[in-house]
Structures are given as structure tokens and as C-alpha cells.
Amino acid sequence: MSKLQSEVLKEAISQVVGESKEKGRKFTETVELQIGLKNYDPQKDKRFSGSVKLPHIPRPKMKVCMLGDAQHVEEAEKIGLDYMDVEALKKMNKNKKLVKKLAKKYHAFLASEAIIKQIPRLLGPGLNKAGKFPTLVTHQESLESKVNETKATVKFQLKKVLCMGVAVGNLSMEEKQIQQNIQMSVNFLVSLLKKNWQNVRCLYIKSTMGKPIRVF
């Protein structure tokens, strides 16, 4: 049972949207969900990580890169998706600095079957360390819908601190859509926690430049 009250959430979203309109910011702000946990020891308790696909894409401009075989490179070119082929990956020669730079440049990676197996050998553990190990794309799937699916997916990963933030929407979306995304994100996160809602200390939502508003 979700303890997130939809009225409280609805009111908070209107506040975030209203504040942004008032300030007339020049870019589309992202809406972030900030989570504080309690009764959780990252040293002892299992550090969870999980991904959930949201009903609406939170960040349409999210940068995705295809690590592709010849066929996928061709498809990526057609849809205007950034890509790297095996030769480009070989050139990186496991150089930690270059791999780190690559991981920083993109929010997420996709990879063809033939390439995904070679990633540890070609790039070392860098992408994995950054929490950006590529998602597999087969030739039976449409690359475009895989890109959209990736853009709609948010990842929760507990590291050493008991707070985290994830992008759950943007201010060009309808308030109802932002609400659906937040509800789904929160319910999924709670399902990952050992004691569910008893591990949640607080939840806030905020826009990129706005102030955080507490919803739980």
C-alpha cells in the first residue's frame, strides 16, 4: 500500500510548475525525486539497484550511445543516434581516462550482442563502475523503440549514502504525467527496500532550479 498521498503530490507538482513559470526560465527544467532513507546500513545491508520503465519519458534529451556491430551502426545513423563501432572501441585501448570521459558524456549505452561480450576486454570495468553498463539490443528489436525504452527507464542504486535523486519528469509534461511517473518510481523504489515504507525517511520533489518540496 503506497503511503504517498496523491493529493499532497498533486499540490506539490502544481507548486513546482507554478514556481518555474513565475521565474520564466529559459530551458525545460527536469523534475527530480529526492529520497532520504532510514534504518539502513549501506555497509551491512544489501546495496540494492534496480531499474523501472516509467509511463512517460522523463528526459527526452537524454544522451544515448550505441556500441554497435555494422548493422546497428547503420540503423543508428538512420535515426540520428550517436554510435561507436568495434574499431572506435579498440582505439580506446582500455585507457581509463578515455573510458571515464565516454561514461560522462552519455547517460546510457546500448550494445549489440557481438559487442557486449567484448566490453570488459575492450574497455575494462569503467562503464560498469559508472553504473552505465550497456543494455543489450538484438537484431529482432527496433533500435528506435529500444532507445525510447532506455530514455523512459530510471535506475535506483544505493551507494554509500542514504540519499539519492532521480529524474522523474520535466516541466514540458502534463502535471498528470509527472504524477504518474513519480508514483511509479516511488512504489518501485519502496519494493526494493528491505522494510519497504519503514525505510523511507523523506521524499522531496524539485525542478532543476527550484526549491525542494516535501511530499512524504
From Swiss-Prot:
Top-level taxonomic group: Eukaryota
Chain segments annotated as transmembrane: none
GO MF term set: RNA binding; structural constituent of ribosome
UniProt keyword Ribosomal protein present: yes
InterPro entries registered for this protein in UniProt: eL8/uL1-like (IPR050257), Ribosomal_uL1 (IPR002143), Ribosomal_uL1-like (IPR023674), Ribosomal_uL1/biogenesis (IPR028364), Ribosomal_uL1_3-a/b-sand (IPR016095), Ribosomal_uL1_CS (IPR023673)
Example GO biological process: translation
Key words, A-Z: Ribonucleoprotein, Ribosomal protein
Gene Ontology CC annotations of this record: cytosolic large ribosomal subunit
Subunit structure: Interacts with the GTPase NUG2.
Family: Belongs to the universal ribosomal protein uL1 family.
Protein name: Large ribosomal subunit protein uL1
Phylogenetic placement of the source organism: Eukaryota, Viridiplantae, Streptophyta, Embryophyta, Tracheophyta
